[in-house]
């Protein structure tokens, strides 16, 4: 399983979050940079563990963070080949 690790510390707008996710997860060029498109792309990933650190910082800075959380939860629930770990800070918090 491929692990993709990101820090959400600089995600103060939805656009920055979408850009970082699209680049790290190699989304197609037609990726729409919205929550529906994020869900679709996450649902289609295979054998990926996405680890996002500094989620507490993103939740403080970004008004729409709860929408991203919903998409992460829904996509991981729908896609058995995708694991998503959301860590409040930076570092290894175990499994």
Task: Explain the meaning of each model-derived region.
Residues 1-95:
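Positively charged, polar, low-complexity stretches
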